[in-house]
């Protein structure tokens, strides 16, 4: 016997309450569409009520995943590399991978990532009091944990640890 999904008729009052809950949730902080959807389902709203609330919020531009990604990137590009930012947006926030990749490609060039990774590495070296090449592996691992690509890490390591050799 094939399983059929029961489609609830749209209850205008519940749909309005779902929208009100969503607006309050969005008032606290910007959220991705998936986070909003999960919140409404967790509150017990049905699919059509959730869709109504989401569409209405999109209409008023309360939910815009592209703008959310740009804002997230603005606040996190100095803390993480592109890979970690993409991971957080796609896996934790539920944003479409293609959208994330396109915006990251447009906004994070290699030069910026190298500069950012260099600053992070210098800060880490200073905090851990690394004075020679023996600590290079720890610095590389730290940058990798922060989400930088190996290509970027290798360039930064070459620049930083060539300086150590000259001293």
Task: Annotate the PLM regions.
Residues 1-167:
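An alpha-helical, amphipathic repeat domain used for nucleic-acid recognition
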């Amino acid at each position: 016997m094939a399983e059929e999904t029961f489609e609830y008729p749209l209850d205008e009052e519940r749909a309005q309450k779902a929208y009100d809950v969503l607006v309050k949730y969005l008032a606290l902080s910007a959220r991705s569409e998936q986070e909003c959807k999960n919140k409404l389902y967790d509150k017990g709203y049905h699919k059509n009520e959730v869709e109504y609330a989401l569409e209405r919020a999109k209409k008023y531009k309360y939910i815009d995943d592209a703008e959310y990604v740009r804002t997230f990137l603005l606040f996190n590009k100095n803390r993480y590399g592109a890979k970690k930012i993409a991971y957080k947006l796609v896996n934790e926030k539920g944003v479409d991978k293609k959208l994330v990749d396109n915006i990251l490609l447009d906004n994070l060039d290699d030069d910026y990532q190298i500069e950012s990774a260099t600053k992070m590495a210098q800060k880490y070296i200073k905090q851990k009091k690394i004075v020679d090449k023996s600590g290079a592996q720890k610095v590389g691992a730290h940058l990798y944990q922060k989400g930088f690509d190996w290509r970027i890490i290798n360039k930064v390591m070459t620049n930083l640890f060539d300086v150590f050799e000259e001293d």
